[in-house]
Amino acid sequence: MNLKQKWDVYSRLTRLDRPIGTLLLLWPCLMALVLAAGGMPDIKVLIIFIIGVVIMRACGCIINDYADRDLDSHVERTKSRPLASGEISTKEALLLFVILGLAAFGLVLLLNGLVVKLSVVGIILTIIYPFTKRVTNMPQMFLGVVWSWSIPMAYAAQTGEVPIEAWWLFAANWFWTVAYDTMYAMVDRDDDLKVGIKSTAILFGKYDRQIIGLFQLAALLCFIAAGWSADRGLLYGLGLLTFVGFSTYQQMLIFGRERAPCFKAFLNNNWAGLALFVGLGADYLF
């Protein structure tokens, strides 16, 4: 395997070729940094968190594919993943995971002690998550915790503490993550039932759209509470209204429960997250 082929394999393993997950992690993290700073965050902290999000997203993908390597080959969407297809060995994948994990931890060591402690919890959660799909019908709810963990870390890095405002944002992102990852799980539902992978899409069954809607509403209310706690104004409110618009569009997409529209609904959450971040940023600027 030449260098170009190796890079292609690593890119697919870490999803560098599919940045949607990184972006969905990035928007709430940036929102947390902006809220914690009351505007523009410390540049050093900002750079560390942006790089950290990219690295930890890659780590999460590697450990997820390692855990699912024997199941992914039976699922249409995942059968070509490098570990499932045998393009890379488990030993090499785990080595890459360790290298990237150490790099992320090295970045964290540039910040304060509270962030370091929170980061240890974060990496443990990242490792545990892929295996929850074997034992619970609610892995998306565990993922919501994993994908929201950068929020208290961001507040800790910027202010040295984690106030109530941070937990409102944490709750908002948790509800939102469960909603959009259930859309994602709807894409694989038929295959998951065959191979024994558990998900909220399976758990919610025929009530999936309604329950996703409730989670979207809960996310909105918590985003409102986070903004209220930080005394945010009109432009943040416009960002929230745009979020509502995107959420409504996603409900239309998943109405027929077909694979392609459900995946499109999942991808659309990137724009919902961008709208929230832009609204928040504009509210501080203007």
Curated annotation (Swiss-Prot):
Q: What does this protein do?
A: Catalyzes the prenylation of para-hydroxybenzoate (PHB) with an all-trans polyprenyl group. Mediates the second step in the final reaction sequence of ubiquinone-8 (UQ-8) biosynthesis, which is the condensation of the polyisoprenoid side chain with PHB, generating the first membrane-bound Q intermediate 3-octaprenyl-4-hydroxybenzoate.
Q: In which pathway does it act?
A: Cofactor biosynthesis; ubiquinone biosynthesis
Q: Whose protein is this, by species?
A: Shewanella sp. (strain ANA-3)
Q: Which residues cross the membrane?
A: 21-40, 96-116, 142-162, 167-187, 210-230, 235-255, 266-286
The highest taxon in the source lineage is: Bacteria
Q: What is its EC number?
A: 2.5.1.39
Tell me which CDD domains the record gives. Answer: PT_UbiA_COQ2
Quick one: a GO cellular component term?
Answer: plasma membrane
The Swiss-Prot or TrEMBL record describes its family as follows: Belongs to the UbiA prenyltransferase family.
Instruction: Indicate where this protein resides in the cell.
Output: Cell inner membrane
According to the UniProt entry, its GO molecular function terms are: 4-hydroxybenzoate polyprenyltransferase activity
What is one Pfam family matched by this protein?
UbiA
- Where is the major localization of this protein? membrane
Swiss-Prot/TrEMBL GO biological process terms: ubiquinone biosynthetic process
Protein name from the UniProt record: 4-hydroxybenzoate octaprenyltransferase
Reaction(s) this enzyme catalyzes, per UniProt: all-trans-octaprenyl diphosphate + 4-hydroxybenzoate = 4-hydroxy-3-(all-trans-octaprenyl)benzoate + diphosphate
- The coding gene here is ubiA
InterPro entries assigned to the protein according to its UniProt record, in alphabetical order: HB_polyprenyltransferase-like, Prenyltransferase, UbiA_prenyltransferase, UbiA_prenylTrfase_CS, UbiA_sf
Q: Which NCBIfam families match?
A: ubiA_proteo (TIGR01474)
Q: Which cysteines are joined by disulfide bonds?
A: none
Please give, as recorded in its UniProt entry, the membrane topology of this protein. Multi-pass membrane protein
Give the cofactors, semicolon-separated. Answer: Mg(2+)
Provide this UniProt record's keywords sorted from A to Z.
Cell inner membrane, Cell membrane, Magnesium, Membrane, Transferase, Transmembrane, Transmembrane helix, Ubiquinone biosynthesis
